Swiss-Prot record:
Keywords: Membrane, Transmembrane, Transmembrane helix. It comes from Saccharomyces cerevisiae (strain ATCC 204508 / S288c). Signal peptide: none annotated. Coiled coil: none annotated. The keyword Membrane applies. It comes from the Eukaryota. The lineage of its organism: Eukaryota, Fungi, Dikarya, Ascomycota, Saccharomycotina. It is a multi-pass membrane protein. This is Uncharacterized protein YMR187C.
Length: 431
């Protein structure tokens, strides 16, 4: 009887690297030619080939060269193989497409896209020559230059992949959304976003009294015209327009942010006391401020301490930008995974919705525990107000969970950078 591994060996493809002539089974360490030729090459061999090619091009005299003269070439190779290199990119390609449409009208090979990304890297570096990889070799058989896929090195991490996909999505969606919505009618868009966020957290009866209006559906009608927006009471407009700014600065401890939050919450408190007689909004504001205070001075400080230790351990593997030697240039939480304006804006817009979903899960868990252990307790508020409390708790829980995920993603990113560094060093030095 034929053993099963005999059929498996027939399925597995055997390859010969045309550089080192080594034969083995095709796996993730190989690169297949995309030019149509039946050729394969090791990732390490391809990187070593590129390294030697650029050393001969930029460093022809290797006798009197200073130490680390090839560091720019090695840095470019690290960026080339980094499967998550967009973590360190400080601009959105969508912004470029909107100003230079030709980038969106043709398929750009990885070499051109890579050079385009590297140009932004070296515009801010002062300690290395501003050159990038200019040659990527050619197929020995058909002589095509665009003959191979981009070699990448990554680690298996679902959390890191989640953050990478989230950053890529926001990089395209937010700039396009701002162009199509904010630039066409920024006032209406800001009003709609603020009202939608308030509806995610507060029930209808609370919003009716807080915003001094018979029904919030009327606000949708008012928002259709400029005259309708002007007819909305000033206090209500401030609450709606300022809500997203309040969320953006809720954990900010700067003087301007504290002043803005104090003024905004004073307006909300005054409106709540004047028009709403249900559950006390001042108590909700007080507890929210206490929770924010505890978050800033306990959890956030603990997270920053962990980030500092992570930077001290893995900061040497960071190859991008000019901030690796200055820890004050960027926040500690952005040292390994940069957050751009579009990612921050998307987080603040979706935060109330995520908090509402999280609060719903917490409420269901609370009711299940109450039924499971037969706890006799009735809250002194309406069901919609009780749900509002859990929505606010859900926002805090979502913020803590998101910060924890970012910390873990930074930890995995540090491991990935270490793996990339070892791969390039071993490939270039021939180890």
């Amino acid at each position: 009887m034929t053993p099963p591994h005999f059929f498996l060996s027939l399925i597995k493809k055997r390859c010969i690297c045309w550089i080192c002539l080594e034969e083995s089974t095709y796996d993730s360490t190989w690169l297949q030619h995309t030019c149509g030729c039946n050729l394969q090459i090791h990732k390490r061999c391809y990187i070593r080939w590129l390294y030697q090619m650029h050393v001969e091009l930029f460093l022809p005299n290797t006798v009197d060269l200073p130490k680390d003269a090839d560091l720019p070439i090695i840095t470019c190779l690290k960026c080339l193989v980094d499967g998550h290199h967009d973590f360190m990119t400080t601009f959105s390609l969508t912004e470029i497409w909107e100003t230079r449409p030709i980038w969106g009208q043709k398929s750009v090979p990885f070499q051109n896209d890579y050079v385009f990304n590297l140009m932004s890297l070296y515009t801010k570096r002062d300690n290395h020559p501003p050159y990038v990889l200019v040659k990527f070799g050619e197929c020995p058989q058909c002589k095509k230059t665009n003959f191979i896929k981009r070699p990448t090195v990554t680690i298996q991490s679902s959390v890191l992949s989640l953050f990478y996909q989230w950053q890529k999505i926001t990089r395209y969606v937010i700039p396009l959304g701002i162009t199509s919505l904010f630039l066409l009618n920024p006032e209406k868009t800001s009003f709609d976003i603020g009202l939608w966020q308030l509806r995610c957290l507060f029930p209808e009866n609370v919003l009716r009294n807080m915003l001094n209006i018979s029904t919030t559906k009327a606000l949708d009608v008012y928002a259709q015209t400029e005259r309708g927006l002007l007819s909305i009471p000033l206090t209500s407009s401030i609450i709606i327009y300022g809500f997203i700014h309040y969320l953006s600065n809720i954990s900010n401890v700067s003087a301007n942010a504290i002043l803005f939050k104090w003024v905004y919450l004073s307006i909300v408190k005054t409106a709540g006391n004047k028009y709403y007689k249900g559950i006390g909004l001042p108590k909700i504001i007080l507890y929210s401020n206490l929770a924010t205070f505890c978050y800033n001075f306990t959890f956030k400080r603990l997270v920053d301490l962990i980030y500092r230790r992570l930077i001290n351990k893995g900061g040497k593997y960071l190859y991008h930008g000019n901030f690796e030697n200055s820890s004050n240039s960027v926040p500690a939480e952005e040292f390994f995974i940069r957050r751009n304006w579009y990612a921050i804006l998307a987080e603040k817009i979706l935060w109330p919705f995520v908090g509402k979903c999280t609060g719903g899960l917490l409420l269901n868990a609370f009711l299940w525990i109450q039924r499971k252990f037969k706890i006799e307790w009735t809250p002194n508020c309406s069901p919609s107000e009780f749900r509002m409390i859990f929505n606010i708790i859900g926002c805090g829980t979502a913020a803590i969970g998101w910060s924890s995920l970012k910390l873990y993603a930074s930890y995995k990113r540090c491991q990935e950078l270490e793996k990339i560094n070892e791969f390039i060093e071993q490939s270039c030095k021939g180890e």
